[in-house]
Design a protein with these regions (language model features):
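Structured mid-to-C-terminal alpha-helical surface segments
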Residues: 3-8, 13, 18-290
Length: 290
């Protein structure tokens, strides 16, 4: 999104809490070399607890205060901790209704009433997923332009914001390893077909060529996931050039097709068909392993 490559709405905002953040700073790094598996597990649990405390005691109240200041009212919206997040590190901003009708091509649920009984794929809330186990490098500062600010720049001159975001090559490898893990049996969750689309779009912009020149970056992504997001089914040991698996098997493909169809309202322009997407992913797998 930060590089203008993904042409769809996002279902969430992923935020990595830096090692120098309050509460996080006091924990020992789980990725440190030379420590035992038990010590790594202990440190990971401590880091998770610190991240939970950071979200609940620092990020949550600051966000709620900032939103109230911006909206000028306490009515029609709320900020809550996501009850469905088992890690207790996600905040939901359920925003007030602005429009009385759906915005063509921008999702049938957009502008839906706050607290409405029915919701589409795009829900009337902003989901902020925090975490401290991910890595923040390599990164660079990028300017984020909201869609409305792009359409009405004179009316929203202060809407642009510079954020530190992961390099696009690292993002590519993060996506590729998700597809690899799904091929090998990692549990498929709702809304995961987006990762196939994102990977295709990154490759279409030539990011695959740039990333392939950085196999060490792929290795870093794999190491982080192996230690911080352990999954016995993911086969991270084979997630390297030559043995990457991106194209899904028939059973997984059928489930992805249904999810991709449901995802259609996230796109602002007609997306590629599911068959076109799968063809592109298969070609990318061959290219990366060649």
């Amino acid at each position: 999104k930060a590089y203008g490559i993904i042409e769809r709405f996002s279902e969430d905002i992923d935020l990595t809490i830096g090692r120098d953040a309050p509460l996080i700073f006091d924990t020992l790094p789980p990725m440190e070399d030379g420590i035992s598996g038990k010590e790594r597990e202990r440190r990971t649990k401590a880091l998770k607890a610190a991240a939970q405390s950071y979200v609940e005691s620092i990020a949550f109240p600051e966000l709620a205060t900032a939103i109230e200041r911006a909206l000028g009212t306490k009515d029609g919206w709320e900020v809550v901790l996501d009850p469905d997040d088992r890690d207790a590190q996600t905040i939901l901003f359920r925003y007030p209704k602005l429009l009385e009708y759906s915005v063509g091509g921008w999702g049938r649920s957009y502008g839906q009433s706050y607290g409405a009984a029915t919701e589409g794929y795009i829900k009337p809330r902003i989901k902020l997923e925090f975490g401290a186990r991910g890595e923040t490098e390599p990164s660079e500062a990028r300017t984020i332009t909201p869609y409305l600010a792009a359409e009405f720049p004179d009316d929203l001159p202060d809407a642009l914001v510079s954020v530190s975001t992961l390099s696009v090559e690292r993002t590519f490898w993060e996506k590729v390893t998700i597809l690899h893990a799904l091929y090998h049996g990692t549990k498929l969750l709702p809304e995961m077909s987006r990762h196939y689309y994102d990977t295709m779009m990154l490759a279409a912009k030539g990011i695959d060529d740039a990333a392939k020149q950085k196999p060490d970056l792929l290795a870093k992504v794999v190491l982080n996931k192996s230690l911080m997001f352990a999954d016995n089914k993911a086969s991270y040991g084979t997630a390297k050039l030559g043995t990457l698996r991106l194209a899904p098997n028939d059973e997984l493909r059928a489930r992805l097709a249904d999810d991709y169809d449901a995802m259609s309202e996230m796109f602002m322009a007609p997306p590629p068909s599911f068959d076109e997407l799968m063809t592109a992913i298969a070609a990318l797998e061959t290219k990366l392993n060649g």
